[in-house]
């Protein structure tokens, strides 16, 4: 099985690859999703067909890219990766699709960022396994049809609502990734420490998990930074005291909140009534998309913020936390 990235600018974060699971049985968390995915893969293999198209959606850092790679390995087929912003014209998409072999997996990250003209080309590729490309200009324009082998498209998005209904409906296997439980994160951190040859105490692993916002990517990033401090100080293991000290230096509090989170909460705290997302974006000098994708999901999960038709509202729980 080959793993190939398409496009000059698509550089998938390879820093976590060595501590990522490589098969579904090793994947921690998302239990129901994994069990269902095993059934779909086994059924496709039994019928010797390409797996139906898969849409992975949910907050950032929950394992969408990892799952896509695992699916290709379980299917024993080649894996090709690109991202929505790189496919700016039909020729870009055609260049990727025409290199696929039967049953290969094509992974499109940030698929919600595809422009509508590319989506329309993708419709026939997904449904009929062919490409209709316009050739020529003006009166001499004609449609060139290119047949494609059956393949599996795996799309990943943090913004499901930005996908057009026609594109969304063409995915036969929509899978929602949820935030991870505390114990699942502890297990992920322990496994990561073993792979990194870093000795870690149970209390330290649990403290990192407490501040990881239910997100494996964050948990592993924090683990790596703590390991840096331990190695520089020539300590033998990651203890609770070391983990707590480093996390505070990194600006991560006991709830896993960082400076941007706190600025967001304080702005709502000091503003009367519901506040619109555009107002928050201007006040914090942050992109609306970044706030909606990386800040709000966790704050909503821990019941610190509510979204209402009139805007964002701080909960009593958040007000109490800010008053501590």
Curated annotation (Swiss-Prot):
<dbReference type="Pfam" id="PF05491">
    <property type="entry name" value="RuvB_C"/>
</dbReference>
<feature type="binding site">
    <location>
        <position position="170"/>
    </location>
    <ligand>
        <name>ATP</name>
    </ligand>
</feature>
<dbReference type="InterPro" id="IPR004605">
    <property type="entry name" value="DNA_helicase_Holl-junc_RuvB"/>
</dbReference>
<dbReference type="GO" id="GO:0016887">
    <property type="term" value="F:ATP hydrolysis activity"/>
</dbReference>
<keyword id="KW-0963">Cytoplasm</keyword>
<comment type="similarity">
    <text>Belongs to the RuvB family.</text>
</comment>
<dbReference type="GO" id="GO:0005737">
    <property type="term" value="C:cytoplasm"/>
</dbReference>
<dbReference type="GO" id="GO:0005524">
    <property type="term" value="F:ATP binding"/>
</dbReference>
<dbReference type="InterPro" id="IPR008823">
    <property type="entry name" value="RuvB_C"/>
</dbReference>
<keyword id="KW-0234">DNA repair</keyword>
<feature type="region of interest" description="Head domain (RuvB-H)">
    <location>
        <begin position="254"/>
        <end position="324"/>
    </location>
</feature>
<feature type="binding site">
    <location>
        <position position="19"/>
    </location>
    <ligand>
        <name>ATP</name>
    </ligand>
</feature>
<keyword id="KW-0227">DNA damage</keyword>
<feature type="binding site">
    <location>
        <position position="312"/>
    </location>
    <ligand>
        <name>DNA</name>
    </ligand>
</feature>
<protein>
    <recommendedName>
        <fullName>Holliday junction branch migration complex subunit RuvB</fullName>
        <ecNumber>3.6.4.-</ecNumber>
    </recommendedName>
</protein>
<dbReference type="InterPro" id="IPR027417">
    <property type="entry name" value="P-loop_NTPase"/>
</dbReference>
<feature type="region of interest" description="Small ATPAse domain (RuvB-S)">
    <location>
        <begin position="181"/>
        <end position="251"/>
    </location>
</feature>
<keyword id="KW-0233">DNA recombination</keyword>
<comment type="function">
    <text>The RuvA-RuvB-RuvC complex processes Holliday junction (HJ) DNA during genetic recombination and DNA repair, while the RuvA-RuvB complex plays an important role in the rescue of blocked DNA replication forks via replication fork reversal (RFR). RuvA specifically binds to HJ cruciform DNA, conferring on it an open structure. The RuvB hexamer acts as an ATP-dependent pump, pulling dsDNA into and through the RuvAB complex. RuvB forms 2 homohexamers on either side of HJ DNA bound by 1 or 2 RuvA tetramers; 4 subunits per hexamer contact DNA at a time.</text>
</comment>
<feature type="binding site">
    <location>
        <position position="61"/>
    </location>
    <ligand>
        <name>ATP</name>
    </ligand>
</feature>
<dbReference type="Pfam" id="PF05496">
    <property type="entry name" value="RuvB_N"/>
</dbReference>
<dbReference type="GO" id="GO:0006310">
    <property type="term" value="P:DNA recombination"/>
</dbReference>
<dbReference type="InterPro" id="IPR003593">
    <property type="entry name" value="AAA+_ATPase"/>
</dbReference>
<feature type="region of interest" description="Large ATPase domain (RuvB-L)">
    <location>
        <begin position="1"/>
        <end position="180"/>
    </location>
</feature>
<keyword id="KW-0238">DNA-binding</keyword>
<feature type="binding site">
    <location>
        <position position="65"/>
    </location>
    <ligand>
        <name>Mg(2+)</name>
    </ligand>
</feature>
<feature type="binding site">
    <location>
        <position position="307"/>
    </location>
    <ligand>
        <name>DNA</name>
    </ligand>
</feature>
<dbReference type="GO" id="GO:0009378">
    <property type="term" value="F:four-way junction helicase activity"/>
</dbReference>
<keyword id="KW-0378">Hydrolase</keyword>
<dbReference type="InterPro" id="IPR036390">
    <property type="entry name" value="WH_DNA-bd_sf"/>
</dbReference>
<dbReference type="InterPro" id="IPR041445">
    <property type="entry name" value="AAA_lid_4"/>
</dbReference>
<dbReference type="InterPro" id="IPR036388">
    <property type="entry name" value="WH-like_DNA-bd_sf"/>
</dbReference>
<feature type="binding site">
    <location>
        <position position="66"/>
    </location>
    <ligand>
        <name>ATP</name>
    </ligand>
</feature>
<feature type="binding site">
    <location>
        <position position="217"/>
    </location>
    <ligand>
        <name>ATP</name>
    </ligand>
</feature>
<keyword id="KW-0067">ATP-binding</keyword>
<keyword id="KW-0547">Nucleotide-binding</keyword>
<feature type="binding site">
    <location>
        <position position="180"/>
    </location>
    <ligand>
        <name>ATP</name>
    </ligand>
</feature>
<dbReference type="Pfam" id="PF17864">
    <property type="entry name" value="AAA_lid_4"/>
</dbReference>
<feature type="binding site">
    <location>
        <position position="64"/>
    </location>
    <ligand>
        <name>ATP</name>
    </ligand>
</feature>
<feature type="binding site">
    <location>
        <begin position="127"/>
        <end position="129"/>
    </location>
    <ligand>
        <name>ATP</name>
    </ligand>
</feature>
<dbReference type="InterPro" id="IPR008824">
    <property type="entry name" value="RuvB-like_N"/>
</dbReference>
<feature type="binding site">
    <location>
        <position position="20"/>
    </location>
    <ligand>
        <name>ATP</name>
    </ligand>
</feature>
């Amino acid at each position: 099985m080959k793993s190939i990235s398409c496009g000059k600018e698509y550089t998938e974060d390879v820093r976590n690859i060595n501590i990522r699971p490589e098969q579904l049985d090793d994947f921690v968390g998302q239990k129901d999703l994994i069990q269902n995915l095993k059934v779909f893969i086994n059924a496709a293999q039994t019928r010797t067909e390409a797996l139906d198209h898969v849409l992975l959606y949910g907050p950032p850092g929950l394992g969408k890219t990892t799952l896509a790679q695992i699916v290709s390995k379980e299917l024993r087929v080649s894996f090709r990766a690109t991202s929505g912003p790189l496919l700016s014209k039909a020729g870009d998409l055609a260049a990727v699709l025409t290199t696929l072999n039967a049953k290969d997996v094509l992974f499109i990250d940030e698929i919600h960022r595809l422009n509508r003209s590319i989506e329309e080309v993708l419709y026939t590729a997904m449904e009929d396994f062919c490409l209709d490309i316009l050739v020529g200009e003006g009166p001499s324009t004609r449609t060139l049809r290119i047949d494609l082998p059956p393949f599996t498209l795996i799309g990943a998005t943090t913004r499901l609502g930005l996908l057009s209904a026609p594109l969304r409906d063409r995915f036969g296997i929509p899978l929602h990734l949820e935030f991870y439980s505390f114990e699942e994160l502890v297990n992920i951190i322990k496994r990561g420490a073993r792979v990194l040859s870093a000795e870690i105490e149970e209390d330290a692993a649990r403290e990192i998990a407490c501040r990881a916002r239910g997100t494996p990517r964050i948990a592993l990033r924090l683990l790596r930074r703590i390991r840096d401090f331990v190695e520089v100080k020539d300590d033998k293991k990651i203890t609770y005291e070391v983990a707590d000290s480093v996390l505070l230096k990194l600006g991560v509090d006991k709830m896993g909140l960082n400076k941007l989170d706190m600025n967001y909460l304080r702005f709502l705290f000091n503003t009367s009534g519901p506040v619109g997302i555009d107002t928050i974006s201007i006040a914090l000098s942050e992109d609306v998309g970044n706030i909606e994708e990386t800040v709000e999901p966790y704050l909503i999960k821990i019941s610190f913020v509510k979204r209402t038709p009139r805007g964002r509202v701080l909960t009593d729980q958040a007000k109490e936390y800010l008053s501590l």
